[in-house]
Amino acid sequence: MSAEHVLTMLNEHEVKFVDLRFTDTKGKEQHVTIPAHQVNAEFFEEGKMFDGSSIGGWKGINESDMVLMPDASTAVIDPFFADSTLIIRCDILEPGTLQGYDRDPRSIAKRAEDYLRSTGIADTVLFGPEPEFFLFDDIRFGSSISGSHVAIDDIEGAWNSSTQYEGGNKGHRPAVKGGYFPVPPVDSAQDIRSEMCLVMEQMGLVVEAHHHEVATAGQNEVATRFNTMTKKADEIQIYKYVVHNVAHRFGKTATFMPKPMFGDNGSGMHCHMSLSKNGVNLFAGDKYAGLSEQALYYIGGVIKHAKAINALANPTTNSYKRLVPGYEAPVMLAYSARNRSASIRIPVVSSPKARRIEVRFPDPAANPYLCFAALLMAGLDGIKNKIHPGEAMDKNLYDLPPEEAKEIPQVAGSLEEALNELDLDREFLKAGGVFTDEAIDAYIALRREEDDRVRMTPHPVEFELYYSV
C-alpha cells in the first residue's frame, strides 16, 4: 500500500484520527494519535518528531528528538476505538540522517532482512510463530516494603471445582495439564477466541486455527499463517493487541507472561522458520528428516548461540520458570524430527515446499523484532561457518538418565545467565551492522534492572521455607 492509497483510505472511511505505533525495546507497543487532517503526502516523507528520551533504554534527554516515520504499507483501520482511526506502524529514525535508529527494534529487524539478502544465501526468510496466552477473570498483585502478593482466579481454574457460586457450580473445567482440545463447556473460551480470529482477519492476519491449550485456567492459542520476518513481527504486535482488547470486551484479562502459574504448563512462542531464494525453499533436501545441508547448518548456528538468543527470545525472569523439565518446555539444545522434547523440531510436512524448522524455546514475552532477528542472525552464522549440529536426538529427552542428559547442552537457566552470554557472544548479531554494541549494551542494562529488582525482592516462598529458621 502506498501513501496515495492511505490518503484515499482516510477519505473513504471518513477517518478522524491516525494512530502512529511503534515498539519499544522491551517489546511493548506505544502510540501517539494525531488528527487525520494532519496527514498529507509530505507526512510520509518527513514523519513526526517525538521525544525519544521517554522510552526506556533509548535517547538521553540531551539528544531526545527522534522521528516517527510512517510505513504506509502497514495501514489498517483500528477495530476498537470509538472514532474512526487508522493505525500506521512506524520506524524510528535519527533526525539528522533519517536512518533507522540503532536501538529501534523494527529497524533492527529490517536491517537483518537486508543483511540476509546481502549475503546471497537467500532472499526471503519466513517466520511462523505460535504465541500462547492465558485468559483470567481476576488478577491481583503487588510488591512493597510491607510485602508481596499475587492472586489469580478464573472460572476454568481446576482449583474452583469446589467453589460455591451463586446459581451453583456447574463443573466442566479442565484439570491441571488437561486443557488440550476438549469441546465446550470444558472449553469456555470458544466464542472469545472466535471473536479474536474475526478481528485479526479484519486487521490483515490469516488465521489457520484456534484452540484451548494444555493448562487449566484458560490457556489458549490462535494459529496464524507465516509471513516474511518483519511483517510477521508486525503481525505479532497486532495479535497481542487484539487478544488483549477482545479479552477486555468479554470481561476477561489476557496475559502473555510465560509462566503465570506454578504447577501447570507455561506459554511458549514456538517459531517455525525457513529460508528461500527465487521462490525455492532452501531448507528442503535429502539429509536428515528431508532437510538440506544449509538447514542443518542453520540449526547448528541456533544451537551454538542459543544461550545468547535466550536473552532476546526469553527476556524476563519469569521466562526461566517456564524453561524447566516436566512442563513440555524444551530445555535440551538438540534437534529431532517430530520429537517435541527437543528444542528444535522438524515438523512433518506434506510437501518439500513446506519444509521448515521449529525453534521451541522462545516465549511470547519476547520482543518479536529482536527475537526473530537474533534467530535469523544465528542461523546465517551457522550457514556461513558450516556449523553442523551433530547427530539428531530422536529419543524422549525428558526421560534420559542423568548421565546421558548431562552430555546434552541446555538453554540458559536464568535471565542473568542469558544476559551474560549475550554480553560475551554478540559478534554474530553485529554482522552487517544489524545490531550495534550500543543497542546490545542498552538492552542488557534494561533487563539487568529487572533482574536485580526481582533478585532483591523477598519472595513469599522464602517465608515458607525460612521464616522459622
UniProtKB/Swiss-Prot annotation:
Name the GO terms of the biological process aspect: ammonia assimilation cycle; glutamine biosynthetic process; nitrogen utilization; response to radiation
Catalytic activity from the UniProt record = L-glutamate + NH4(+) + ATP = L-glutamine + ADP + phosphate + H(+)
Entry's InterPro entries? Gln_synt_N (IPR008147), Gln_synt_N_sf (IPR036651), Gln_synth/guanido_kin_cat_dom (IPR014746), Gln_synth_cat_dom (IPR008146), Gln_synth_gly_rich_site (IPR027303), Gln_synth_I (IPR004809), Gln_synth_I_adenylation_site (IPR001637), Gln_synth_N_conserv_site (IPR027302)
Judging by the UniProt lineage, the source's domain of life is: Bacteria
User: Where is this protein localized, as stated in its record?
Assistant: Cytoplasm
For molecular function, the Gene Ontology terms on record are:
ATP binding; glutamine synthetase activity; identical protein binding; metal ion binding
**List of residues binding L-glutamate:** N265, G266, R322, E328, R340, R360
Protein residues bound to Mg(2+) 1: E130, H270, E358
What quaternary arrangement does the UniProt entry report?
Oligomer of 12 subunits arranged in the form of two hexameric ring.
Q: What is this protein called?
A: Glutamine synthetase
- Which species is this record about? Escherichia coli (strain K12)
Lineage, top ranks: Bacteria, Pseudomonadati, Pseudomonadota, Gammaproteobacteria, Enterobacterales
